[in-house]
Amino acid sequence: MLTLRHKYLPFFMWLFPLLFFAYQFILRLWPSLMMNQIMDQFSINASHFGMLAAFYYYGYSVMQIPVAILLDRFSARRIIFVFAVLCGLAALMFTYTSNFYLALLSRFLIGVGSSVGFLGVSKVISEWFPKVQYARMIGFSFTFGLMGGIYGGRPVSMVIETYGWQMVAVVLAYISLMIGFATYFALRSPQNIKKSISDVPHESFKIANFKAILTSPFIWLLACSNLLMVGSLEGFGDVWGVPYLMTAYAINKGDAAGLISFIFFGMLFGGPLLALCSKRFGNYSVIGMCGFTMMLIFVLLLQSKTYNPIKLSFLFFVLGIICCYQVIVFSAGSSLVEPKNLGITIAFLNCINMLGGSFFHTVIGKIMDIFWAGALNDSGVRIYDIYAYKYSLSIVPVCAGLGSIIIVLVGFRVQNSYNQVKSKEFLISEG
């Protein structure tokens, strides 16, 4: 019995950060389900709504490197507890305030709290599981975590319609608090932590290592390409997709959220599929292909006038698959730096990636206000027609195409540099 208990103990410990990782997807998608209510609550336009959505990503991105350092210095139990409680309190603040600036602060804090989601899972896996199981457990974690994105769509929308958004928001806030306290009282580190991915000797964070990343033009171009291509997920999928579908096809919120959920279904399969493609065709070719495919999907989507749920589900499923290009970006980045700089490189790329969400939400909101036709509802809140949505969302395929061009050029340049190095090594060996 004791052996059996110890056999399943790592999975029990893994459960707590995993629950928070899945939960934070629901808070991330919350504005997409509440656009009209939020605009009415704070008497704001699309530009301010985009800013409100963007502040989540500001908080999330700026904490990537600090959270990684905190998890190494303190236990995962303490850090996940603090950040989960912060998420819950910030969600309560957002629910009950009518002050727009407090709402901005609360969304920023929710982003800060959510930043420990994946990093906390990674830390616990590295402590409790053998090194050979790390990749498999990370894959399982992403699969379970994306369920938060799936259930954060239509199911949550249906609950909102039944019980009201404020009641649902309060329940979600208390769930975060419960996860935090459960983690604090139940999660532990192994008494004898065996060497694993995070336990192998490594250098502590040094400014010189970070400077090496910031002075690499290839890393910057890779990061900028990633930012430009992230609009399909963090711009459209996270926030603007649901209101767009409701306006374009006159469907209810639940059906629109259900269609958007196919993006997250696609992401369940995208990681392994694109990894196989990258081995055959190369990282940069696959990333470029994903960007051009995104552009094509959005051209088809924005030109479509007839509501066809099967067609839309298929497009969003494919979109979800190619949104996993971000995994290949990390792989490409790892090949550009020395092993000692790998961790800080991944954190930097992920930071810029999440800033892409802030960029797209802000720009989309601004463009919507530019093309606002002047309609207001009974509360005096702006109503945006389909043309405002189409003009604003056109930024997504334009940026995806631009990012693809940059990434293809970077791929050619990296390959040329690699060939030159090999040629020099060959000449030296021959000499």
Model feature map: region roles:
Residues M63-S75, G271-G282:
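Helix-to-loop junctions at the C-terminal end of transmembrane segments
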